[in-house]
Amino acid sequence: MTPVRDSKTMQCDGFMTIPFPAELCERMTRHIRGHIRHATGISVLENAPVEELTSAVAALSDDAFVEQFRKPLRIFPHELSGAVAEWIGSLADFLGGSRCGINYISPSEHAANPALQATSHDVFWRCVRPGKPDVGQPHADFQFWEINRGTPLDPPSPFPYDERWKIWLPLLGCDATNSLEVLQGSHREDIPLESIQTKYGTKPAIRMDWLAANEHRFFCPLPPFQNHCVLFHDKLVHRGPANATSHLRISGELTILLKL
């Protein structure tokens, strides 16, 4: 792979697709199936296809889904997130830094899920149901860090860092019509950022007229999908589109902290 600092595509576009370890993908999907089995009370198979998982989740009411699929419950277990963090640590040279890692979970998330540890890494997954409003507004990830700074949602860092990068990982039910969409080159632009109040707290947003004028620029940077992920700048505007398919969309996420 071309190192990030040498990649003209990364510098201009703000993203690139890189391989993700297949063994970690398998462990992550195995855990997700187990969570769905526990949350729904339905004995889905160990290797259940996304259609079977969709039927199980559809048995939950909207309120039950929100409760059982809260973000603190979607953080991967300590050992698994640690294995992902170990792989991320091997990418320092590729990213052009001296050290890289993943932030820990926030104090609020630890309190909400005592099965985790204060030093559990913030590697989590999302589950978007078909035809449901399970997605947020287009945003750039650095907005979350600004909004949450100094609050119980502010995640501790294992070391001082200079840059943040994001990884989005397709796991189940993801295709070119139903996956992350990015706004190419937006990390180099002056974006009219906003924040909005929701029933889940303050969330990042972007001024609606600007989004409308730039709607045509959003696109999915994948394929390939299997055992690959999107690495992107934390100021790149992106979104998870509404799920217009007949099955769940399940993906993984993490933030990379890079010391130059």
Model regions and ranges:
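A short hydrophobic beta-strand segment most commonly corresponding to one strand
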Residues: L169, Q184, H247-L260
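Signature of the catalytic double-stranded beta-helix
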Residues: A59-K132, Q137, R149-D162
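Short beta-strand His + acidic residue motifs that chelate non-heme Fe in jelly-roll/DSBH
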Residues: V237-T245
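Extracellular structured ligand-interaction cores
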Residues: F15, S120-D122, D162-W168, T177-S179, ...
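Short, conserved beta-strand element in jelly-roll/cupin
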Residues: I147-D175, P224, T255-L258
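N-terminal auxiliary "cap/dimerization" subdomain that precedes the catalytic jelly-roll/cupin core
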Residues: M1-G101, P224-F225
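Double-stranded beta-helix
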Residues: Y161, D175-V237
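Histidine-centered catalytic micro-motifs
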Residues: V135-W145, V237
